[in-house]
């Protein structure tokens, strides 16, 4: 399943320079920061929203407010193959 994350970032340097420890079965094919780095959208492929939430919030909750949702793949355009 694909999961979209939306980030409102208070410390862009810390957020964008951090590393995520992705568990097996979780991929991060797209990362899209805003020009000034205070907003961002990421696309994950994983087994559940909860898996992505645990990884992202665990690494960034001190510097970002994060939103998560599973994508309706049947209605989406342009998802990675």
What are these regions (language model features)?
Residues 1-57, 62-64, 68-81:
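Short S/T/G/P-rich N-terminal loop/turn motif that feeds into the first structured element of a domain
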């Amino acid at each position: 399943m694909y999961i979209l994350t939306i980030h409102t970032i208070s410390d862009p340097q810390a957020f964008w320079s951090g590393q995520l420890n992705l568990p097996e079965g979780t991929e991060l094919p797209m990362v899209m920061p805003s020009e000034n780095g205070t907003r961002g959208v990421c696309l994950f492929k994983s087994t559940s929203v909860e898996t992505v939430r645990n990884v992202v919030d665990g690494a960034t909750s001190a510097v970002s407010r994060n939103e998560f949702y599973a994508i309706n793949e049947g209605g989406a355009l342009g998802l990675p193959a």
